Amino acid sequence: MYSILKDAYSFDERCAQCWDGNWRETDDFFFDHPEIADKYGFATCFNGEPIGFICWDPRNRPEYVEIGHNAIRTAWKGNGFGKAQLTEALRRIREYAGLKEIRVRTNSNLIAPRNYESVGFVLYDRKENPGETAFSGDDLYYRIQLQREQMGNA
């Protein structure tokens, strides 16, 4: 997972300078807890090669589940793998009984906002990012409200 995250954000060396520790912690956590890895994330593979990774935090259920890391290796970007990966994660997350929302936080200068919006996420908050990661843009907060979806399907 670490190598996928590092490669996915290689377009700007400041990403690794700011987030390398977090990427390593995520990799270590999932390696040390394989029983969690299979329930709350997955790797996207093409021809047996891991090209992407996504994970989510279910601890705030039933109020919401928050998507964490969501990355595709640089060589595979622009081929629909990111949207397919996110769509599959949403399918799995929607299986939680009584879940009200799916949330994600990203940054305005990344390409991620377009991907989230393309699968139904709606922006509900935007905050200035004055810290060391300011180069990545404002913090954007997105959600999909599932209670409305469920009411529409009833």
Predicted segments with their positions:
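Conserved beta-strand in the GNAT
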Residues: 43, 49-58, 64-66, 71
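Conserved N-terminal entry element of GNAT/NAT acetyltransferase domains
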Residues: 2-7, 145-154
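Conserved acetyl-CoA-binding loop-helix of GNAT-fold acetyltransferases
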Residues: 72, 78-91, 117-118
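Conserved GNAT-fold acetyl-CoA-binding loop/helix
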Residues: 3-31, 39
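Conserved GNAT acetyl-CoA-binding A-motif
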Residues: 93-106
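Conserved beta-strand-loop-alpha-helix junction that forms the acyl-donor binding cleft
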Residues: 103-113, 129-135
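Conserved acetyl-CoA-binding loop of GNAT-fold acetyltransferases
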Residues: 117-126
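Short hydrophobic/aromatic beta-strand or adjacent loop that forms the aromatic wall/cage
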Residues: 39, 136-143
